């Protein structure tokens, strides 16, 4: 059993890339003991300037763990994928060709209506060849996540021995405390999450935060049963030379953070994201969205989803990064086979024009998922 996925992506009119991956697995249960193994086969062609670790890894072990079910407590050790809440800080990185896995231990407990997860892990760093994925010797993650009805509470600790923010590199120890409220009432649904971060980095203290909101309403009386969605995110950034690092670290977030093909990550940003989802048929859905991005502080630049700086602040005076429109169509052709396509265009704003090249990015994606 498993899943295979192929995608073709086109950025502007010149760049084309094809990415394919397969994730078969074997899952053995003997009494209260479970053994699970999942290889990954991931290749990429045409990625410019070169395919990175999230694009290809050859053939390797994505997951391989043993699990013991003790009733109210489940213990797991080995290589595993993690998904906490909405994957704002810890996710499977689905979207890029190579999902994210961790090596370590996890315990899940049921305490009345609460679900408690404890974890101590290190991320897996994919290599360019086969069977060369390795446990990170620089990064570590530990913490606790409590899921209650319509409420999540969590603490996550993170260490990076060689973190880089701007021109400075050093040891980062960061603590994240978060709360999430979510649920539905009739045709309305909501998902609101806030995170505060503190710690130290290269002789500076850390003080960072984020607030994300999503409010949606279904309109079942209208044709195509539209759902109107409004998302807004505010993520802190750094201010120059004040002895405090204000740059938020999203740790290990989901790959499709702001949309199917967004080039901007959740650091030093203000984002507005209205959209509508339509049910064309039981097996066919369409979503259309618009995004606008601003820098939260002028003293910090913009980052990609993994947290790498992609444009420094320079001498720019503008906060406005740009706008994006996106449409995604998904067809569940069979219970096992899903086809989807995405079309997106990102138009640069004044900040990008003030700091370097600023061309419109046009993106087109085709994706096929087969679960067997």
What are these regions (language model features)?
Residues 51-53, 90-95:
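"Short basic amphipathic alpha-helical interaction patches in structured regions
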Residues 42-44, 81-84, 124-125:
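Solvent-exposed loop/turn segments at secondary-structure junctions
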Residues 1, 82, 235:
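Hydrophobic pocket-lining residues within nucleotide cofactor-binding pockets
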Residues 32, 71-75, 93-241, 279, ...:
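Signature for the C-terminal beta-barrel architecture of outer-membrane proteins
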Residues 241-257:
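Acidic/polar loop-and-plug regions of large Gram-negative outer-membrane beta-barrel proteins
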Residues 60-61, 90-91, 101:
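Short acidic (Asp/Glu) patches
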Residues 47, 87, 162-165:
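Short, solvent-exposed polar/charged micro-motifs at secondary-structure junctions
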Residues 1-79, 105-110, 182-191, 197, ...:
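Beta-barrel outer-membrane channel/assembly domains of diderm bacteria
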